[in-house]
Amino acid sequence: MQLNPSEISDLIKTRIEGLKAGADAKNTGTVISVTDGICRIHGLSGVMQGEMLEFPGNTFGLALNLERDSVGAVVLGDYEHISEGNEVKCTGRILEVPVGPELLGRVVNALGQPIDGKGPINAKKTDVIEKVAPGVIARQSVSQPVQTGLKSIDAMVPIGRGQRELIIGDRQTGKTAVAVDAIINQKGKGIFCVYVAIGQKASTIANVVRKLEEHGALEYTIVVAAAASDSAAMQYLSAYAGCTMGEYFRDRGEDALIVYDDLTKQAWAYRQVSLLLRRPPGREAYPGDVFYLHSRLLERAARVNAEHIEKITNGEVKGKTGSLTALPVIETQAGDVSAFVPTNVISITDGQIFLETDLFNAGIRPAINAGISVSRVGGAAQTKVVKKLSGGIRTDLAQYRELAAFAQFASDLDEATRKQLERGRRVTELLKQPQYQPLQVWQLAASLYAANNGFLDNVDVKDILAFEKGLHDQLKTKYADLINRIEDTKDLSKDDEAALRAAIEDFKKSAAF
């Protein structure tokens, strides 16, 4: 059988002419109104909740409200060029962000697009920003520590890998400082970090990035920035985008730490979006699902077992557990932790670090209130040496604060009470720490040992920090073997304890502080 070329071309022409190329009416719609980054769209009867929509000018949006005859969507980015009557298309995709080691050292927005001027990010993978948290069977108990390098946290409210530890306090109490110090201290510890800045001034975010760079911490950190000038939708989505980037490491048998700074502003952004979408307001004008907003985010931070990782990586990674540790930050108003969002997040997390304005103003920094700061699961993850030595510190501090309040009214104090007050003053002074100077485990062990065994009792309160610095310097120069043993074993054997005691006694005799 011979084919005639002209017949074939005629057949193709006929087919092309008869082709109906019009888009399916289900998947296109028309903009009815656009206000404050919220679009109402007529049509789109086939759209899914959370689906990406394509607007003119290569702009995308997110379908959030599915109503009987219209769809409410938030525009991701500029919306000034969108006008009534514009056509909108469904994309059939859920919002995804790039993930992987290519993002380390970069500053990106809530959509994973670089905003640091260092060129494009060639990430090999993308992942959806909304994911279901690992189930009970996939999880493993928290048993390894995350060292923050801050004496008061590592000793009194220890954090474990896979834990959610809330940092809560009024504005200007050092919440970001605690989180940034924790990131800086992960250098060389194999923990990847994600810092999510939500609703902060661009200058503040730039300052944090500069500090991370100065301390060599940016190389293992991803910064997700949704500044105060960005739209409410971007501020609301940035936390989920950062979480997905952190989960990439968790699901490959690595350890990651994520800081959400702060979730109060994310709740405000979500409230704004919800009210503009005409959703019914509840307590403090927040929508009804504001608890779910934070619980579905924070439940994704977990320690997962080797079977879960093997299943996710299709057998590529075997015999490794992974973790994502979350440090959410909440800003309170005048220390009111019983407000709506603070109580929600306190009930979701595994403990909280409470920072107080009065302590901060009194020069006690980090301004951690030892009485109401707790870590519900971190104790199991604390290093042996710190666990041994830190038991007395918390009790000393709590009793000191209580006694100090009574001592104001009492003129004649008995000897035991006076001693306890003196010890408390010294412990309070010892737990002060300058910013960007995290301590290693051996330094913390030496400081705690000196406090517990009365070596500070005859040192003037004003000289405590100088004493501590001098002790650390002498241990570093004269007792390197002891330091290495403590760092390697993370424990204090009887011999090492005797050596440490002798070293401190030797230092006190020299009085080199």
Swiss-Prot record:
GO terms for cellular component: plasma membrane; proton-transporting ATP synthase complex. One of its GO terms (molecular function) is ADP binding. The record marks 373 as: Required for activity. It is a peripheral membrane protein. ATP binds at residues 169-176. The keyword rRNA-binding does not apply. Its main location: membrane. It holds the Pfam family ATP-synt_ab. Keywords: ATP synthesis, ATP-binding, Cell inner membrane, Cell membrane, CF(1), Hydrogen ion transport, Ion transport, Membrane, Nucleotide-binding, Translocase, Transport. It is found in: Cell inner membrane. It catalyses: ATP + H2O + 4 H(+)(in) = ADP + phosphate + 5 H(+)(out). Its EC number is 7.1.2.2. Belongs to the ATPase alpha/beta chains family. F-type ATPases have 2 components, CF(1) - the catalytic core - and CF(0) - the membrane proton channel. CF(1) has five subunits: alpha(3), beta(3), gamma(1), delta(1), epsilon(1). CF(0) has three main subunits: a(1), b(2) and c(9-12). The alpha and beta chains form an alternating ring which encloses part of the gamma chain. CF(1) is attached to CF(0) by a central stalk formed by the gamma and epsilon chains, while a peripheral stalk is formed by the delta and b chains. PANTHER family: ATP SYNTHASE SUBUNIT ALPHA, MITOCHONDRIAL (PTHR48082:SF2). Produces ATP from ADP in the presence of a proton gradient across the membrane. The alpha chain is a regulatory subunit. This is ATP synthase subunit alpha. It comes from Ralstonia nicotianae (strain ATCC BAA-1114 / GMI1000).
